[in-house]
Swiss-Prot record:
Similarity comment text for this entry: Belongs to the conotoxin M family.
Signal peptide residues on this chain, from the entry's feature table: 1-20
Protein name: Mu-onotoxin-like Am3.2
A cellular component term, taken from the record's GO annotations: extracellular region
Domain of life: Eukaryota
Natural source organism: Conus amadis (Amadis cone)
């Protein structure tokens, strides 16, 4: 009987922290759809090459525009 209670106690203690911690809804990782709607100006995009004035061909799929190809 004691071993069953011990197993139940361990299971409850392991599961409690996973369900008791409130999730922070303000994190960008929690809102991918909202993050994708934000329009980054081309000049400030991290894949924008200031010397060439355009993004590389590989950056087109990542959302950098204009693509010069």
């Amino acid at each position: 009987m004691m071993s069953k209670l011990g197993v139940l106690l361990i299971i409850c203690l392991l599961l409690f922290p996973l369900t008791a911690v409130p999730l922070d809804g303000d994190q960008p990782a929690d809102r991918p759809a909202e993050r994708m709607q934000v329009d980054i100006p081309t000049e400030h995009h991290p894949m924008f090459g200031a010397v060439r004035g355009c993004c590389g061909a590989w950056a087109c799929m990542a959302g950098c525009r204009p693509c010069c190809g």
